[in-house]
């Protein structure tokens, strides 16, 4: 009985692992955005989607409009993941969302949901269609 239960659990874990491998960058990022146990902010969640755990501590202070120059934290995280494409990422993000500044995206009546910023930034960093 215990063996059958363990085998079933192992099968479930394998299926989950396979599904995680085929998730898009946006899906990976959104799966950790403001979700327990980590409660990652926008910048952290984009970095985590690419396995960049080395950036998570530094990105703690970059959510909620606190990234340098008031940049959207999700975009800032994407730039940390792919710094060689910083200008390309910024231009594509602006084309999709209308701005790169968090205050312009969120100020007053929010124009773009944080989840959309996270999804777009992750897709762009991965080179996926945003």
Predicted features along the sequence, with ranges:
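A short glycine/serine-rich beta->alpha loop
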Residues: 29-37, 61-70, 106-110
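Serine residues within intrinsically disordered or low-complexity segments
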Residues: 5-8, 12
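Beta-strand segments within the central parallel beta-sheet cores of soluble alpha/beta enzyme folds
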Residues: 55-64, 90-94
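Short, positively charged and aromatic/hydrophobic N-terminal segments
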Residues: 18-19
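Helix-rich "cap/lid" substructures immediately adjacent to catalytic or cofactor-binding pockets
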Residues: 35-61
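DPxDG-like acidic metal-binding loop motif
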Residues: 78-84
């Amino acid at each position: 009985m215990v063996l059958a239960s363990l085998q079933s659990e192992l099968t479930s874990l394998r299926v989950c692992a396979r599904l995680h491998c085929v998730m898009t960058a946006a899906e990976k990022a959104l799966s950790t955005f403001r979700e327990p146990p980590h409660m990652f902010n926008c910048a952290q969640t984009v970095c985590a989607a690419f396995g960049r755990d080395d950036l998570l501590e530094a990105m703690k202070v970059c959510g909620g409009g606190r990234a340098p120059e008031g940049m959207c934290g999700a975009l800032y995280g994407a730039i940390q993941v792919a710094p060689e494409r910083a200008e390309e990422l910024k231009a594509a993000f602006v084309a999709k969302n209308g701005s790169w500044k968090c205050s312009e995206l969120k100020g007053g009546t929010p124009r773009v949901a944080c989840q959309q910023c996270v999804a777009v930034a992750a897709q762009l960093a991965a080179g996926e269609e945003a």
